[in-house]
Amino acid sequence: MNRFPTERPADFVDDLKVPAAPDALFFIVREGKLLLSDAGELPSGHSLAGQAVIALGRLGERPVFALPLTGEAPAGAQLVGLRQCFGVLPDGLFGLAGLAVQLVDFQRSHQFCGACGTPMRPGEGDRARRCPSCGLRVYPRVAPAIIVLISRGTGPDTEFLLLRGPRQAPDVFTTLAGFVEPSETLEAAVHREVGEEVGVKVRQVQYRFSQPWPFPHSLMLAFTAEYAGGDIVPQPGEVEEAQWFTVSDLPQLPPTFTASRRLLDDALATLRLSGDFATT
């Protein structure tokens, strides 16, 4: 399976003690945005002296760091939203950009202990923040979320249940997704979210793959499921429109770097391999 661009590159090694070097790679972040040159390149040649630098690791032999930008973007550079960096950054760097944005935000939002208010300190040997007063330790947040492709029928009669949310483009439809609740299994989350968002029931829930999703700090767990009954009832405020689409007449789909798109592409590829249906 091809790697998602939101993943860490295969040749990246996590290293909290990586030393500085002249060829070091820097992800400079402010409010979830990356500092890029006007040519769309990452900054280089920065000094680490006196800066709240976060060691990420090594990309091959090249040290990689993240650090917050406290002022405005300098001349010849601009702050670019993480989503807008897709296709701009070289291959393999988008996933590290997501890691940098998440860790800078974690450091910013955990400057003080949530239990006693004492200034937090970096953990030793891990990504945690620790309180020197009461001993509280907190780690970078990862919010698990399920995403599921619901289908019915076989061969050329296969249909997918797709929806459009209030924050999506009006002509783009995607698969259903939602966060996992405390004490809930992933499979139970699939059944609950399907019932809440579109009002139908499903069966044959099967795990497919996962994808890190740094918007802002999710891990997508992808599933497929078969329709088991019920009428579509869109959840008010969460789902603008939901309907069945035949595989020969699909709407505009999400970008290729999303878990939703991979679920759909994999399902279509399976239909092609079955030999009884050709998709274009």
UniProtKB/Swiss-Prot annotation:
Gene: nudC
Its job: mRNA decapping enzyme that specifically removes the nicotinamide adenine dinucleotide (NAD) cap from a subset of mRNAs by hydrolyzing the diphosphate linkage to produce nicotinamide mononucleotide (NMN) and 5' monophosphate mRNA. The NAD-cap is present at the 5'-end of some mRNAs and stabilizes RNA against 5'-processing. Has preference for mRNAs with a 5'-end purine. Catalyzes the hydrolysis of a broad range of dinucleotide pyrophosphates.
Binding site for a divalent metal cation 3: E193, E197, E238
Motif placement: Nudix box: 178-199
Superkingdom of the source species: Bacteria
Cofactor note: Divalent metal cations. Mg(2+) or Mn(2+).
Domain Nudix hydrolase: 140-268
Cofactor(s) for this UniProt protein: Mg(2+); Mn(2+); Zn(2+)
Catalytic EC class: hydrolase
Taxonomic path: Bacteria, Thermotogati, Deinococcota, Deinococci, Deinococcales
Positions bound to a divalent metal cation 1: A177, E197, E238
Protein name, as recorded: NAD-capped RNA hydrolase NudC
UniProt keyword annotation of Iron present: no
Species of origin: Deinococcus radiodurans (strain ATCC 13939 / DSM 20539 / JCM 16871 / CCUG 27074 / LMG 4051 / NBRC 15346 / NCIMB 9279 / VKM B-1422 / R1)
PROSITE patterns in the record: NUDIX, NUDIX_BOX
Pfam families noted in UniProt: NUDIX, NUDIX-like, Zn_ribbon_NUD
